[in-house]
């Protein structure tokens, strides 16, 4: 596998017919519910993030395939194994939402986990790892797995690399049944603040915001030496103020600026690097300032 293969994600499928209509309605209802819940709902925080994660898992398994390239004989629709992933995602969300009070009141590492707790916790971790692989690639997923293995087997390593014994139940207790693991600050921020700003940025971009920023950048830097590269930097910075996402920034502005840079002689790798660097910097500009700022702010409250 090439280096790029470690970063490759699954191809995006677009189911048609009844399944496509159902998924579209599901996604719309999910966005509306999430926006309402983030602002007005008095749901317990654990219930909110549990349902949010479950809904997101269902969307990923429904729309992103397990492989990076679409096979020639690939039928349109969702494979049977992905329907099982969808079912497992729903079951995990329902289980943890129904048991939110028991989870919130239990004493960590003292109250034992039941067999059902261990089963659903293990299943949820597997589902999240698979979603990570499909959306980001093998590299980040491999790093996460390495740290998980280190947690479980680090006690066999010599000093200074080893640590005290951590059993599997202990590991699940911290990762799933406390706010220091999967249901911690990053997911809570994503389910509240980040979702609203990404929703705002999406509406603005589809209303012509991305084209406006590109035109504004072209008027400022288009006539200068290295104009297309400067247009990429300025437009990505401006678009980053409303998206907060380097990925959406690259997709929106890069689809215009990268071909412009290649047309005047920039190597493809340089053109891509300029756009990626500009989009990454643009994602931390106010007012959205990326999700990291919200995570930092919430951690210090």
Give, region by region, the residue ranges found by the protein language model:
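Conserved small/polar residues in nucleotide/adenosyl-binding loops
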Residues: 299-301
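Conserved, well-structured core domains of diverse proteins
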Residues: 1-111, 118-122
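Hydrophobic transmembrane alpha-helices of multi-pass solute/ion transporters
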Residues: 73-77, 104-199
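Hydrophobic alpha-helical transmembrane segments of multi-pass membrane proteins
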Residues: 119, 187, 200-204, 238-245, ...
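Short hydrophobic alpha-helical membrane-embedded segments
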Residues: 23-27, 115-123, 227-231, 267, ...
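C-terminal ends of transmembrane helices
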Residues: 62-73, 128-133, 205-211
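Hydrophobic transmembrane alpha-helices that form the pore/transport pathway of multi-pass ion
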Residues: 214-282, 288, 292
């Amino acid at each position: 596998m090439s280096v790029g293969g470690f970063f490759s994600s699954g191809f995006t499928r677009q189911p048609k017919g009844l399944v496509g209509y159902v998924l579209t309605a599901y996604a719309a209802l999910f966005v509306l519910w999430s926006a309402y819940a983030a602002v007005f709902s008095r749901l317990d925080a654990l219930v909110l993030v549990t349902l949010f994660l479950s809904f997101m898992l269902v969307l990923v398994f429904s729309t992103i395939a397990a492989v990076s390239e679409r096979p020639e004989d690939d039928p349109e629709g969702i494979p049977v194994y992905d329907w099982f992933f969808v079912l497992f995602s729903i079951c995990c969300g329902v289980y943890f939402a129904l048991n939110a009070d028991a989870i919130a009141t239990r004493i960590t590492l003292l109250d034992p986990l039941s067999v059902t707790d261990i089963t659903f916790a293990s299943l949820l971790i597997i589902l999240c790892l698979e979603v990570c692989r499909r959306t980001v690639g093998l590299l980040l997923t491999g790093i996460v797995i390495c740290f998980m293995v280190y947690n479980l087997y680090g006690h066999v390593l010599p000093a200074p690399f080893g640590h005290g014994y951590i059993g599997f139940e202990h590991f699940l207790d911290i990762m799933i049944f406390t706010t220091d693991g999967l249901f911690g600050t990053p997911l809570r921020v994503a389910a509240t603040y980040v979702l609203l700003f990404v929703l705002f940025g999406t509406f603005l971009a589809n209303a012509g915001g991305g084209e406006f920023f590109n035109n504004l950048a072209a008027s400022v830097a288009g006539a200068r030496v290295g104009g297309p590269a400067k247009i990429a930097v300025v437009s990505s910075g401006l678009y980053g103020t409303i998206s907060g996402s380097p990925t959406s920034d690259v997709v929106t502005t890069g689809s215009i600026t990268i071909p412009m840079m290649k047309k005047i002689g920039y190597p493809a790798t340089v053109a891509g690097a300029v756009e990626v660097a500009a989009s990454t910097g643009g994602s931390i500009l106010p007012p959205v300032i990326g999700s990291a700022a919200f995570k930092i702010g919430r951690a210090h409250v």
